Curated annotation (Swiss-Prot):
Catalyses which reaction(s): glycerol + ATP = sn-glycerol 3-phosphate + ADP + H(+)
Record: residues binding ATP: 12-14, 268, 312, 316, 413
Binding site for ADP: 12, 16, 268, 312, 413, 417
Keywords: ATP-binding, Glycerol metabolism, Kinase, Nucleotide-binding, Transferase
Top-level taxon of the source organism: Bacteria
Residues at which sn-glycerol 3-phosphate binds: 12, 82-83, 134, 246
Any one Gene Ontology cellular component term annotated for this protein: cytosol
Gene3D superfamilies documented for this protein: 3.30.420.40
Pathways per UniProt: Polyol metabolism; glycerol degradation via glycerol kinase pathway; sn-glycerol 3-phosphate from glycerol: step 1/1
Catalytic class of the enzyme: transferase
Keyword Chloroplast attributed: no
Protein name listed in UniProt: Glycerol kinase
HAMAP family per record: Glycerol_kin (MF_00186)
Organism: Pseudarthrobacter chlorophenolicus (strain ATCC 700700 / DSM 12829 / CIP 107037 / JCM 12360 / KCTC 9906 / NCIMB 13794 / A6)
Length: 504
């Protein structure tokens, strides 16, 4: 009995439930994609009701495949796409608008307006983040300002906000029938509203945004029992005991618990997190300061993060928008058929540029095209753009920390691509290491939940679960490395200053 932990991984493109055993191995999983809604250029939405329905389906699927019941599950952990904002009516359980996704850029006017008084970094010392469309705060304000009746309902105390962790937890624990309205410190640190030192909502910033305090969930640690699954659900009476935003969860799943350890997750975007321990480090090089994790009553661990908006989604774009490939894995075959990129560089600034530039005026660019270039070169350039962007973030981490990283742990869907991982090692000049369990995001959430209920006893036990699967050593000489980075940086400059009054 109680031999397993289940993690709900509510991601940007799909929702998964993964069951882990005590060794951290995957026992079974269920997965369902949800619709990507693009009402206008720059707008990205999800149907929150669809996400909740899918969550129930994937839990059932994972249990069924392993022939398990709720009696076999010690705890539930939740991990999620961060920043994606859901606002719902707590009396009906209905969202007042679609979830506005982290990639969405519709709130640029709000960012510009708020930046007039004190600049884009006016809140950064307190919350660790620049003013940007990326974070939840501007999305909540947009919903209150633009959805009929939303502000009135919010001020009457009927509307609540949560990222998708909070939305799933609220529904899982009963919804309108006593659902728990809680988030953890890692998700709260991505709203623009949480004070990094007090780990509480900042009343002054909420006031500036015009967001009622009553909308905000209670902030708790990443590893404690928040409540139990409602009696109407398959996992009824199972404790929900861990929540981590997806990138922090991946860091935790990689057992990067010590100061100076880092990981890079390759998914829809790329996210490099560098553990700074109990110290809050403010970046001078375009990185975010965020909460890494907090276990129960222990002190929080902080991190520097380099967030890259578009990596894996560039491959989706080649497939879905251009029809250049019919499945994502094809891109590796095409890329491997040419010896280099043919002089082509792709800067996938579909939503502007995130770290380390923070340039919302940038848009996607393909540069260096000649008659010689074919689709194989384009495929290679698409993969290489992920590695180039990661190198720029790693350079920023090294500059901020003063201690150059000697290796990079990697995870996420794209790390199955050997060609990309080799090029990543080449362009970084340090070894790249893939663990045996690459589902580190879900594993991190499972670990947080399991620790809270005593399924695992301490971090040492989790560290002993980690094992290396493959390592890529750099094979490119430094002169060629720097030549390619010089051309990449030149390409990046070509993507900037595109958006103005004529081009939105």
């Amino acid at each position: 009995m109680n031999q397993y932990v289940i993690a709900i991984d509510q991601g940007t493109t799909s929702t998964r439930a993964i069951i882990f055993d005590h060794s951290g191995a995957i026992v079974s999983s269920g997965q369902m994609e949800h619709e990507q809604i693009f009402p206008k250029a720059g707008w990205v939405e999800h149907d929150a009701a669809e996400i909740w329905n899918n969550t129930r389906e994937v839990i059932a699927s994972a249990l069924s495949k392993a022939n398990l019941t709720r009696h076999d599950i010690a705890a539930v952990g939740i991990t999620n796409q961060r920043e994606t904002a859901v606002v719902w009516d707590k009396t009906t359980g209905e969202p007042v608008y679609n979830a506005i996704v982290w990639q969405d850029t519709r709130t640029q006017d709000i960012v510009d307006e708020l930046s007039k008084d004190g600049g884009g970094d006016r809140f950064k010392q307190k919350v660790g983040l620049p003013l940007a469309t990326y974070f939840s705060g501007t999305k909540i304000k947009w919903i209150l300002d633009n959805v009929d009746g939303a502000r009135e309902k919010a001020e009457a105390g009927n509307l609540v906000f949560g990222n998708t962790d909070c939305w799933v937890l609220w529904n899982l624990t009963g919804g309108v029938d006593g659902g728990v309205h809680v988030t953890d410190v890692t998700n709260a640190s991505r709203t623009l509203f949480m004070d990094l030192e007090t780990l509480q909502w900042d009343e002054e910033i909420l006031g500036i945004f015009g967001v009622p305090r009553s909308m905000m969930p209670e902030i708790k640690s990443s590893s404690e029992v928040y409540g139990t699954v409602h009696t109407s659900q398959l996992l009824r009476e199972t404790p929900v005991a861990g929540i981590l935003g997806d990138q922090q969860a991946a860091t935790f799943g990689q057992a990067a618990f010590e100061t100076g350890e880092a990981k890079n997750t390759y998914g829809t975007g790329c996210f490099l997190i560098f553990n700074t321990g109990e110290e809050i480090v403010h970046s001078k090089n375009g990185l975010l300061t965020t909460v890494g994790y907090k276990l129960g009553d222990a002190k929080p661990h902080y991190a520097l993060e380099g967030s890259i908006a578009v990596t894996g989604s560039l491959i989706q774009w080649l497939r879905d928008n251009l029809g250049m490939i019919s499945s994502a894995p094809e891109v590796e075959t095409l890329a491997a058929s040419v010896k280099d990129n043919g002089g082509v560089y792709i800067v996938p600034a579909f939503s502007g540029l995130f770290a380390p530039y923070w340039r919302p005026d940038a848009r996607g660019a393909i540069v260096g095209l000649t008659r010689f270039v074919n689709k194989n070169h384009i495929a290679r350039a698409a993969l290489e753009s992920t590695a180039f962007q990661t190198r720029e973030v790693l350079d920023a981490v090294n500059a901020d920390s003063g201690v150059p990283l000697t290796e990079l742990k990697v995870d996420g869907g794209m790390v199955a691509n050997d060609a990309l991982m080799q090029f990543q090692a080449d362009i970084l000049g340090v070894p790249v290491i893939r663990p045996k369990v690459i589902e580190t995001t879900a594993l991190g959430a499972a670990y947080a939940a399991g620790l809270a209920v005593g399924f695992w006893k301490d971090l040492g036990e989790l560290s002993s679960n980690w094992s290396e699967d493959k390592r890529w050593e750099p094979q490119l000489d430094q002169a060629e490395q720097e030549r390619q980075m010089r051309l990449w940086r030149k390409a990046v400059t070509k993507s900037m200053d595109w958006v103005d009054e004529d081009v939105k």
